[in-house]
A protein has these predicted regions:
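Active-site-proximal beta-strand elements of phosphoester/diester hydrolases
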Residues: 127-138, 259-269, 296-300, 364-372, ...
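Active-site neighborhood of phospho(di)ester-bond hydrolases with catalytic His/Asp-centered motifs
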Residues: 133-134, 170-177, 207-217, 265, ...
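Active-site environment of divalent metal-dependent phosphoester hydrolases
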Residues: 139-141, 180-183, 215-224, 270-273, ...
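Active-site-proximal segments of metal-dependent phosphoesterases and phosphodiesterases across multiple
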Residues: 141, 269-279, 290-339, 361-362, ...
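Conserved beta-sheet core of the metallophosphoesterase superfamily
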Residues: 213, 313-387, 550-582
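A short, polar/proline- and glycine-enriched secondary-structure boundary/capping micro-motif
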Residues: 273-276, 377-379, 606-612
Length: 640
């Protein structure tokens, strides 16, 4: 008989009688896990189970831009990216790593091979369809609605003469800000890759479409690392959902049929086209483009709008790089930029060159189409009905442009702004910020007043004024709050900053005073509390009141700012989280070489989705639970 082996405690560990233990993986001892980990799998101990874990298939909500944690995280990342972005420009590294000045030829057909797309035998294209989608990768409903529409083999859109079928784009171009709020591999997967994978589904076309992407400022917040891995790297295979990826840099040039070209530029964080990028475009123009060729130029932001908006406010944005690229790189070779496409502003707005400026030629189009999934931006906050370029070279003519279409229209945009009256309900977590400020202020005032409980508001006001005059720390705290409101005010005018910031401060301080005194009065006279209990009850009341009143004041401030002064458009509409009014562009180079742009809109995106059923005529894995009408924003735009 073989004796048992001695245990670690020196005693013999004889096997216990009974049935043998179930087989487990070698080295795995579940009984040795921490108690909380073992209990977490039991439904009786569900509080220990982390139910909020996000998987790659999670249907993400719209980004809560006014959530305190989100505000802090995004603010820090944007400041860091601005501080180090200029010194760690990944575009320079890309230029050094890929010295070939190459373009991607889509004037030919491709076939799918084991090593990616290869030119087909009967290669020459006589026409091409191209989709342009900007500002996507936000909430599931809005992002997937656009992805679903773009991924269908054909879209039927109504026209006066009857519905027209628009085939899916042979090429998909993302025009910037592919993910929100900040880039990471996880966010790209959840907010961009997963929706487009589900939308493309199990479709297996004979010739898969290709995808290219221009990075926006949100893609740059990590130095472009996640973007580069997804769109510019061989890691993980050259696939994005059902599309092939091919680009090696964050900027690219596509050759299209009939002497059309598409140029995708990378303006980093400040709409700055770096020298290697300019030289890349210049060399391709010199070697491959010919006089009479036409260019579609894609940018990450509408610099023509920002230049007009800030022209008299310090020239924060200008069109110098844009005009230099047009005049010095292309025009000197007889190549003309006919269309400018961009996003960044999450609405649709088309500017067309005026007849006087075009001088008998086909007018140039400048189109902002940022409706790929992100929250809606207003169209009524700024007068950009007429844009005037500034000539930056002696032989360049200054061109004028006028608005031809906006979506949503300006009146509807102004009406949507009234949603800020429900700011409290649309951004419930934001209330912790004013609630904390109100509570700390009331606490400091109460401590300075020696715990006195004034019986009327006039006495309370006098006690408060005395507290400020005799306690410098309290005065400095409140001065810091005022400075914060002044800094928050969205303006380049010192007068408006002071007036707007002070009025905003007065509104909050008034709410603080009445809520703080009211909570103390209720605790004293109604609840007959005293001492620590009174202070605790008054603190709870002040916190709750600050949560509600602070959010209401913020909503009113944003509404007045955007509808009266045309300021805070970003804040006023990001808090609304409008999922609707989504859109994208479908471009068509036809057999005769004419370019037509179809601006496609989804007025209301579905809120309910279901898995594809047997009777659904689509390859998408998820379909709307109901109808999703697709229409045109305006009649198709015939460029040339």
């Amino acid at each position: 008989m073989i004796p048992p082996e001695p245990g670690l405690d020196g005693d013999a560990d004889a096997p216990a009688p009974g049935p043998p233990a179930p087989a487990t993986a070698e080295g795995y001892q579940p009984d040795a896990l921490p108690i909380a980990r073992r209990l977490a799998t039991s439904p009786l101990f569900f509080p220990l189970w982390f139910r909020g874990r996000l998987g790659p298939e999670t249907r993400m909500p719209m980004v809560g831009w006014f959530d305190p944690a989100q505000l802090l995280s995004t603010g820090i990342k944007s400041l860091v990216s601005l501080a180090v972005g200029e010194q760690s420009d990944r575009r320079i590294v890309q230029a050094l790593a890929s010295r070939r000045q190459e373009y991607y030829d889509h004037a030919i057909h491709y076939r799918d091979g084991s090593r990616g797309p290869q030119p087909a035998k009967d290669a020459v294209r006589d026409e091409l369809w191209l989709d342009f989608i900007c500002d996507t990768g936000d909430g599931w409903n809005s992002t997937y609605a656009v992805a679903y529409a773009a991924a269908q083999r054909s879209l039927l859109v109504p026209l006066d003469g009857g519905p027209v079928a628009l085939p899916r784009g042979d090429v998909l171009v993302f025009g910037g800000d592919e993910v929100y709020p900040t880039p990471s591999r996880e966010e790209y997967q959840r907010r961009l890759v997963a929706p487009y994978t589900a939308a493309f589904g199990d479709d297996a076309p004979a010739e898969r479409p290709h995808v290219y992407a221009v990075p926006g400022n949100h893609d740059w917040y990590d130095g472009l690392s996640a973007f580069t891995r997804l769109f510019c790297s061989d890691i993980g295979g050259r696939r994005f959902a059902g599309w092939w990826t091919r680009q090696r840099r964050s900027y690219f040039v596509l050759k299209l049929p009939h002497r059309w070209w598409l140029v995708g530029s990378d303006g980093q964080l400040q709409s700055d086209l770096d020298v290697p990028q300019m030289e890349h475009f210049r060399e391709i123009a010199e070697r491959y483009m010919q006089a009479g060729d036409r260019v579609i130029l894609c940018l990450s932001m509408p610099v023509w709008v920002y230049a007009q908006k800030y022209r008299n406010m310090g020239r924060v944005f200008d069109e110098t790089d844009l005009i230099y690229l047009r005049e010095e790189v292309f025009a000197k070779r007889g190549v003309e930029v006919k269309v400018y496409l961009t996003g960044d502003l999450h609405h649709y707005r088309r500017h067309q060159e005026t007849a006087e400026s075009a001088a008998g030629e086909a007018p140039v189009q400048k189109i902002t189409a940022g409706g790929g999934g992100a929250f809606l931006h207003p169209t009524h906050e700024e007068d950009v009905s007429v844009l005037q370029e500034e000539a930056v070279t002696d032989d360049a003519r200054a061109r004028a442009f006028e608005v031809k279409a906006t979506y949503p229209d300006m009146k509807r945009s102004a009406r949507l702004a009234f949603g800020n009256l429900r700011f409290l309900f649309k951004n419930p977590r934001f209330g912790v910020v004013p609630a904390t400020i109100y509570l700390i202020t009331a606490w400091l005032v109460g401590a300075a007043a020696g715990g006195e409980a004034p019986s009327n508001p006039w006495r309370a006001l006098r006690v408060t004024v005395d507290a400020f005059s005799t306690h410098p720390g309290l005065a400095l705290w409140c001065a810091g709050i005022v400075l914060g409101f002044l800094a928050f005010t969205d303006t380049h005018s010192r007068v408006y900053r002071v007036v707007g910031g002070l009025l905003h401060s007065v509104a909050h301080f008034s709410a603080m005073f009445y809520i703080g005194w009211g909570a103390l009065d209720v605790a004293t006279r109604w609840l007959h509390a005293s001492g620590v209990l009174r202070a605790a009850l008054a603190g709870v009341g002040t916190f709750i009141g600050g949560w509600i009143a602070g959010s209401v004041v913020m909503g009113i401030y944003l509404l007045v700012s955007v509808n009266v002064f045309g300021r805070h458009s970003e804040e006023a509409f990001s808090g609304l989280k409008v999922e609707d009014f989504k859109h994208f562009l479908r471009l068509h180079v036809d057999r005769e070489g004419h370019l037509t742009i179809w601006p496609i809109k989804i007025e209301r995106v579905p809120r309910r989705w279901r898995d594809r059923g047997e009777g659904d005529a689509t390859t998408s894995r998820v379909v709307p639970d109901g109808t999703m009408p697709v229409e045109l924003i305006e009649p198709p735009i015939h460029v040339a």
